Amino acid sequence: MKSIWKKAALAVLVGAMAVSFTGCGGEKKAEAPAAKKESKEITVYMGVVEQSAKVVASEFEKDTGIKVNFVRMSGGETLSRIRAEKNNPQASVWYGGSADSFIMAKKEGLLEAYKSPNAEKIKPEFKDADGYWTGIYQGYLGFILDGRYFDEHKLQPPTSWDDLLKPEFTGQIVMGNPGSASTGYVVVSAIVQSMGEEKGMEYLAKLNKQVKQYTKAGAAPARSAALGEAAIGITYLHNGIRLIKEGNTNVRLSLPEEGTAYELGAVAIIKNAPDMEAAKKFVDWALTKKAQEIGQHNNSYQFLTNPEANPPEEAMKFKDAKLIDYNFQWSGDNRARLLEAWNKAVKE
Protein backbone atom coordinates (compact mmCIF):
# COMPACT_ATOMS: atom_id res chain seq x y z
CA MET A 1 0.00 0.00 0.00
CA LYS A 2 2.85 2.40 0.92
CA SER A 3 4.48 1.56 -2.41
CA ILE A 4 1.32 2.58 -4.26
CA TRP A 5 1.13 5.90 -2.39
CA LYS A 6 4.84 6.59 -3.04
CA LYS A 7 4.32 6.02 -6.75
CA ALA A 8 1.30 8.32 -6.78
CA ALA A 9 3.16 11.04 -4.91
CA LEU A 10 6.11 10.72 -7.29
CA ALA A 11 3.80 11.07 -10.27
CA VAL A 12 2.24 14.24 -8.83
CA LEU A 13 5.71 15.69 -8.12
CA VAL A 14 6.94 14.95 -11.65
CA GLY A 15 3.77 16.49 -13.10
CA ALA A 16 4.18 19.61 -10.99
CA MET A 17 7.80 19.96 -12.08
CA ALA A 18 6.78 19.56 -15.70
CA VAL A 19 4.16 22.28 -15.33
CA SER A 20 6.72 24.46 -13.57
CA PHE A 21 9.31 24.04 -16.35
CA THR A 22 6.66 24.57 -19.02
CA GLY A 23 5.63 27.75 -17.26
CA CYS A 24 9.23 28.95 -17.19
CA GLY A 25 9.56 28.24 -20.88
CA GLY A 26 6.35 30.17 -21.54
CA GLU A 27 7.64 33.14 -19.56
CA LYS A 28 10.86 33.22 -21.62
CA LYS A 29 8.87 33.29 -24.88
CA ALA A 30 6.74 36.12 -23.58
CA GLU A 31 9.87 38.13 -22.76
CA ALA A 32 11.36 37.75 -26.25
CA PRO A 33 11.55 41.13 -28.03
CA ALA A 34 8.71 41.84 -30.42
CA ALA A 35 9.48 42.08 -34.12
CA LYS A 36 10.53 45.58 -35.11
CA LYS A 37 7.63 47.46 -36.63
CA GLU A 38 8.18 48.97 -40.06
CA SER A 39 8.69 52.72 -39.81
CA LYS A 40 5.87 54.96 -41.00
CA GLU A 41 8.18 57.94 -41.32
CA ILE A 42 11.35 58.56 -43.30
CA THR A 43 13.85 61.39 -43.77
CA VAL A 44 15.02 62.12 -47.32
CA TYR A 45 17.72 64.52 -48.52
CA MET A 46 16.38 66.00 -51.77
CA GLY A 47 18.23 67.73 -54.59
CA VAL A 48 15.17 68.60 -56.69
CA VAL A 49 13.41 71.98 -56.64
CA GLU A 50 11.32 72.76 -53.55
CA GLN A 51 7.93 72.46 -55.24
CA SER A 52 8.75 69.05 -56.72
CA ALA A 53 10.17 67.89 -53.40
CA LYS A 54 6.92 68.75 -51.61
CA VAL A 55 4.78 66.89 -54.14
CA VAL A 56 7.11 63.87 -54.19
CA ALA A 57 6.85 63.67 -50.40
CA SER A 58 3.06 64.06 -50.47
CA GLU A 59 2.46 61.50 -53.24
CA PHE A 60 4.75 58.91 -51.66
CA GLU A 61 2.84 59.23 -48.40
CA LYS A 62 -0.49 58.85 -50.24
CA ASP A 63 0.72 55.70 -51.99
CA THR A 64 2.46 54.02 -49.05
CA GLY A 65 1.26 55.63 -45.82
CA ILE A 66 4.88 56.56 -45.01
CA LYS A 67 5.43 60.22 -44.12
CA VAL A 68 8.43 61.94 -45.69
CA ASN A 69 10.44 64.56 -43.84
CA PHE A 70 12.70 66.13 -46.46
CA VAL A 71 15.64 68.51 -46.40
CA ARG A 72 16.33 70.39 -49.65
CA MET A 73 20.05 70.76 -50.44
CA SER A 74 22.41 70.95 -53.40
CA GLY A 75 24.35 67.83 -54.37
CA GLY A 76 27.62 69.00 -52.85
CA GLU A 77 25.91 69.99 -49.61
CA THR A 78 24.20 66.62 -49.39
CA LEU A 79 27.45 64.75 -49.89
CA SER A 80 29.10 66.82 -47.14
CA ARG A 81 26.17 66.21 -44.78
CA ILE A 82 26.20 62.44 -45.34
CA ARG A 83 29.96 62.39 -44.73
CA ALA A 84 29.52 64.27 -41.46
CA GLU A 85 26.76 61.90 -40.34
CA LYS A 86 28.55 58.72 -41.42
CA ASN A 87 28.63 57.22 -37.92
CA ASN A 88 25.08 58.27 -37.08
CA PRO A 89 22.96 58.65 -40.25
CA GLN A 90 20.07 61.08 -39.87
CA ALA A 91 18.42 60.36 -43.24
CA SER A 92 17.63 57.16 -45.11
CA VAL A 93 17.48 58.27 -48.76
CA TRP A 94 19.29 60.68 -51.08
CA TYR A 95 16.97 61.77 -53.91
CA GLY A 96 18.13 64.04 -56.74
CA GLY A 97 21.53 65.49 -57.54
CA SER A 98 24.15 64.51 -60.08
CA ALA A 99 25.41 60.93 -60.24
CA ASP A 100 29.00 62.21 -59.98
CA SER A 101 28.39 62.89 -56.29
CA PHE A 102 26.69 59.53 -55.79
CA ILE A 103 29.69 57.77 -57.32
CA MET A 104 31.96 59.60 -54.89
CA ALA A 105 29.66 58.60 -52.03
CA LYS A 106 29.78 54.96 -53.11
CA LYS A 107 33.57 55.11 -53.25
CA GLU A 108 33.64 56.41 -49.66
CA GLY A 109 31.28 53.70 -48.40
CA LEU A 110 28.41 56.09 -47.72
CA LEU A 111 25.70 54.27 -49.69
CA GLU A 112 23.81 51.00 -49.29
CA ALA A 113 23.53 48.60 -52.23
CA TYR A 114 19.95 47.91 -53.29
CA LYS A 115 18.81 46.61 -56.68
CA SER A 116 15.18 47.60 -56.96
CA PRO A 117 13.04 45.33 -59.15
CA ASN A 118 11.85 48.53 -60.84
CA ALA A 119 15.42 49.28 -61.93
CA GLU A 120 15.42 46.37 -64.38
CA LYS A 121 13.73 48.44 -67.11
CA ILE A 122 16.23 51.31 -66.79
CA LYS A 123 19.21 51.36 -69.19
CA PRO A 124 22.53 50.10 -67.76
CA GLU A 125 24.23 53.45 -68.42
CA PHE A 126 21.68 55.12 -66.15
CA LYS A 127 22.43 53.05 -63.04
CA ASP A 128 25.23 51.66 -60.92
CA ALA A 129 26.05 48.06 -61.82
CA ASP A 130 26.25 47.11 -58.14
CA GLY A 131 22.97 48.77 -57.21
CA TYR A 132 24.34 51.64 -55.14
CA TRP A 133 22.38 54.29 -57.08
CA THR A 134 19.87 54.49 -59.91
CA GLY A 135 19.25 57.37 -62.31
CA ILE A 136 15.85 59.09 -62.30
CA TYR A 137 16.30 62.02 -64.72
CA GLN A 138 18.65 63.78 -67.17
CA GLY A 139 19.32 67.50 -67.38
CA TYR A 140 21.29 69.16 -70.20
CA LEU A 141 23.88 71.79 -69.31
CA GLY A 142 23.49 75.15 -71.05
CA PHE A 143 23.30 78.93 -70.81
CA ILE A 144 20.37 80.83 -69.32
CA LEU A 145 20.34 84.36 -70.75
CA ASP A 146 18.90 87.73 -69.80
CA GLY A 147 17.46 88.69 -73.19
CA ARG A 148 17.21 92.35 -72.20
CA TYR A 149 20.99 92.60 -71.80
CA PHE A 150 21.58 91.07 -75.23
CA ASP A 151 19.00 93.33 -76.89
CA GLU A 152 20.29 96.50 -75.24
CA HIS A 153 23.89 95.76 -76.20
CA LYS A 154 23.00 94.24 -79.59
CA LEU A 155 24.84 91.00 -78.77
CA GLN A 156 24.51 87.50 -80.16
CA PRO A 157 23.83 84.72 -77.63
CA PRO A 158 26.79 82.46 -76.79
CA THR A 159 26.73 79.16 -78.66
CA SER A 160 30.08 77.75 -77.52
CA TRP A 161 32.22 77.62 -74.40
CA ASP A 162 34.74 79.95 -76.08
CA ASP A 163 32.02 82.57 -76.58
CA LEU A 164 31.87 83.01 -72.80
CA LEU A 165 35.40 84.46 -72.87
CA LYS A 166 34.41 87.46 -75.02
CA PRO A 167 35.14 90.87 -73.45
CA GLU A 168 31.47 91.87 -73.47
CA PHE A 169 30.72 89.10 -70.97
CA THR A 170 33.35 90.06 -68.40
CA GLY A 171 31.66 90.19 -65.01
CA GLN A 172 28.37 89.06 -66.56
CA ILE A 173 28.49 85.31 -65.82
CA VAL A 174 27.19 83.40 -62.81
CA MET A 175 27.69 79.67 -62.16
CA GLY A 176 27.43 77.23 -59.29
CA ASN A 177 30.40 76.79 -57.00
CA PRO A 178 31.92 73.42 -57.99
CA GLY A 179 32.62 72.64 -54.35
CA SER A 180 29.05 73.06 -53.09
CA ALA A 181 26.88 72.66 -56.20
CA SER A 182 26.99 69.45 -58.20
CA THR A 183 26.00 71.55 -61.24
CA GLY A 184 29.18 73.58 -60.88
CA TYR A 185 31.26 70.43 -60.66
CA VAL A 186 29.66 69.04 -63.83
CA VAL A 187 30.83 72.21 -65.63
CA VAL A 188 34.41 71.57 -64.46
CA SER A 189 34.31 67.89 -65.35
CA ALA A 190 32.68 68.53 -68.73
CA ILE A 191 35.33 71.08 -69.72
CA VAL A 192 38.15 68.75 -68.68
CA GLN A 193 36.62 65.78 -70.48
CA SER A 194 36.10 67.86 -73.64
CA MET A 195 39.41 69.74 -73.75
CA GLY A 196 41.79 67.56 -71.76
CA GLU A 197 42.95 68.34 -68.24
CA GLU A 198 45.72 70.86 -68.98
CA LYS A 199 43.78 72.89 -71.56
CA GLY A 200 40.59 72.45 -69.56
CA MET A 201 42.08 74.02 -66.44
CA GLU A 202 43.57 76.82 -68.54
CA TYR A 203 40.10 77.51 -69.92
CA LEU A 204 38.49 77.44 -66.47
CA ALA A 205 41.10 79.92 -65.21
CA LYS A 206 40.14 82.28 -68.06
CA LEU A 207 36.43 81.71 -67.40
CA ASN A 208 36.98 82.57 -63.75
CA LYS A 209 37.97 86.11 -64.79
CA GLN A 210 34.56 86.45 -66.48
CA VAL A 211 32.56 85.15 -63.53
CA LYS A 212 30.73 87.64 -61.35
CA GLN A 213 29.66 85.11 -58.72
CA TYR A 214 29.85 81.43 -57.80
CA THR A 215 26.58 80.45 -56.15
CA LYS A 216 26.02 77.89 -53.40
CA ALA A 217 23.20 76.16 -55.32
CA GLY A 218 23.42 75.05 -58.93
CA ALA A 219 20.01 76.41 -60.01
CA ALA A 220 20.67 79.94 -58.69
CA PRO A 221 22.51 81.21 -61.82
CA ALA A 222 19.29 80.88 -63.82
CA ARG A 223 17.47 83.13 -61.36
CA SER A 224 20.33 85.67 -61.54
CA ALA A 225 19.88 85.92 -65.31
CA ALA A 226 16.11 86.23 -64.99
CA LEU A 227 16.49 89.10 -62.50
CA GLY A 228 19.03 90.91 -64.67
CA GLU A 229 21.79 90.43 -62.11
CA ALA A 230 23.92 88.77 -64.80
CA ALA A 231 23.71 88.31 -68.55
CA ILE A 232 24.49 84.58 -68.45
CA GLY A 233 23.81 81.84 -65.94
CA ILE A 234 25.56 78.51 -66.52
CA THR A 235 23.26 75.75 -65.33
CA TYR A 236 20.83 73.14 -66.62
CA LEU A 237 18.37 74.17 -69.31
CA HIS A 238 15.40 72.90 -67.31
CA ASN A 239 16.11 75.62 -64.74
CA GLY A 240 15.62 78.17 -67.51
CA ILE A 241 12.49 76.45 -68.80
CA ARG A 242 11.02 76.72 -65.31
CA LEU A 243 11.63 80.48 -65.23
CA ILE A 244 10.02 80.95 -68.64
CA LYS A 245 6.99 78.98 -67.45
CA GLU A 246 6.83 81.28 -64.43
CA GLY A 247 6.42 84.29 -66.73
CA ASN A 248 9.98 85.58 -67.10
CA THR A 249 9.66 86.65 -70.73
CA ASN A 250 13.22 88.01 -70.83
CA VAL A 251 14.76 84.57 -70.32
CA ARG A 252 16.34 82.86 -73.33
CA LEU A 253 18.21 79.59 -73.66
CA SER A 254 21.26 78.45 -75.58
CA LEU A 255 23.90 75.75 -75.30
CA PRO A 256 27.41 74.96 -76.54
CA GLU A 257 26.89 73.59 -80.03
CA GLU A 258 30.19 71.70 -80.01
CA GLY A 259 28.60 69.41 -77.44
CA THR A 260 27.32 69.74 -73.91
CA ALA A 261 27.31 67.59 -70.82
CA TYR A 262 24.34 66.39 -68.88
CA GLU A 263 23.60 65.47 -65.32
CA LEU A 264 22.11 62.16 -64.37
CA GLY A 265 20.00 62.76 -61.30
CA ALA A 266 19.92 59.72 -59.04
CA VAL A 267 18.37 58.11 -55.98
CA ALA A 268 20.15 55.96 -53.38
CA ILE A 269 19.85 54.52 -49.90
CA ILE A 270 22.24 55.95 -47.33
CA LYS A 271 24.52 53.44 -45.56
CA ASN A 272 23.01 52.14 -42.30
CA ALA A 273 19.79 54.01 -43.01
CA PRO A 274 17.68 54.32 -39.85
CA ASP A 275 14.55 53.26 -41.78
CA MET A 276 15.86 50.65 -44.21
CA GLU A 277 12.59 49.01 -45.29
CA ALA A 278 10.91 52.37 -45.86
CA ALA A 279 14.00 53.46 -47.81
CA LYS A 280 13.68 50.49 -50.16
CA LYS A 281 10.02 51.31 -50.71
CA PHE A 282 10.95 54.89 -51.54
CA VAL A 283 13.53 53.82 -54.13
CA ASP A 284 11.05 51.36 -55.67
CA TRP A 285 8.45 54.11 -55.89
CA ALA A 286 10.89 56.74 -57.25
CA LEU A 287 11.60 54.56 -60.28
CA THR A 288 7.94 54.22 -61.29
CA LYS A 289 6.30 56.00 -64.22
CA LYS A 290 4.04 57.95 -61.86
CA ALA A 291 6.86 59.21 -59.67
CA GLN A 292 9.06 60.27 -62.58
CA GLU A 293 6.25 62.23 -64.25
CA ILE A 294 5.60 64.32 -61.12
CA GLY A 295 8.35 66.82 -61.93
CA GLN A 296 6.93 68.20 -65.18
CA HIS A 297 3.76 69.24 -63.37
CA ASN A 298 5.76 70.90 -60.60
CA ASN A 299 8.44 73.09 -62.15
CA SER A 300 10.90 70.34 -63.14
CA TYR A 301 11.48 69.72 -66.85
CA GLN A 302 14.18 67.06 -67.13
CA PHE A 303 14.29 64.04 -69.42
CA LEU A 304 13.38 60.80 -67.61
CA THR A 305 15.05 57.40 -67.23
CA ASN A 306 11.98 55.16 -67.00
CA PRO A 307 11.18 54.31 -70.66
CA GLU A 308 7.47 54.14 -69.82
CA ALA A 309 7.42 57.70 -68.44
CA ASN A 310 6.46 60.57 -70.76
CA PRO A 311 9.08 63.36 -70.88
CA PRO A 312 7.91 66.98 -70.51
CA GLU A 313 6.98 68.60 -73.82
CA GLU A 314 8.97 71.70 -72.89
CA ALA A 315 12.22 69.71 -72.85
CA MET A 316 11.68 68.09 -76.24
CA LYS A 317 13.01 71.21 -77.99
CA PHE A 318 16.47 70.08 -76.89
CA LYS A 319 16.11 66.33 -77.41
CA ASP A 320 18.49 66.40 -80.39
CA ALA A 321 21.16 68.51 -78.67
CA LYS A 322 24.71 67.29 -79.28
CA LEU A 323 26.06 65.64 -76.15
CA ILE A 324 29.64 64.84 -75.26
CA ASP A 325 30.52 61.33 -74.14
CA TYR A 326 30.35 62.36 -70.50
CA ASN A 327 31.94 59.71 -68.28
CA PHE A 328 30.12 59.73 -64.93
CA GLN A 329 32.32 57.05 -63.39
CA TRP A 330 35.51 58.92 -64.21
CA SER A 331 33.96 62.18 -63.06
CA GLY A 332 32.93 60.70 -59.72
CA ASP A 333 36.22 58.90 -59.16
CA ASN A 334 38.23 62.07 -59.84
CA ARG A 335 35.98 64.59 -58.07
CA ALA A 336 38.30 65.43 -55.19
CA ARG A 337 41.34 65.74 -57.45
CA LEU A 338 39.57 67.92 -60.03
CA LEU A 339 38.17 70.23 -57.37
CA GLU A 340 41.65 70.69 -55.95
CA ALA A 341 43.03 71.43 -59.42
CA TRP A 342 40.19 73.89 -60.11
CA ASN A 343 40.77 75.72 -56.83
CA LYS A 344 44.44 76.06 -57.70
CA ALA A 345 43.70 77.22 -61.26
CA VAL A 346 41.27 79.99 -60.30
CA LYS A 347 43.56 81.34 -57.56
CA GLU A 348 46.58 81.77 -59.81
Predicted stretch roles:
Residues I144-Y149, E263-D275, A286, I294:
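A bilobed periplasmic-binding-protein/Venus flytrap-type ligand-binding module shared by bacterial periplasmic
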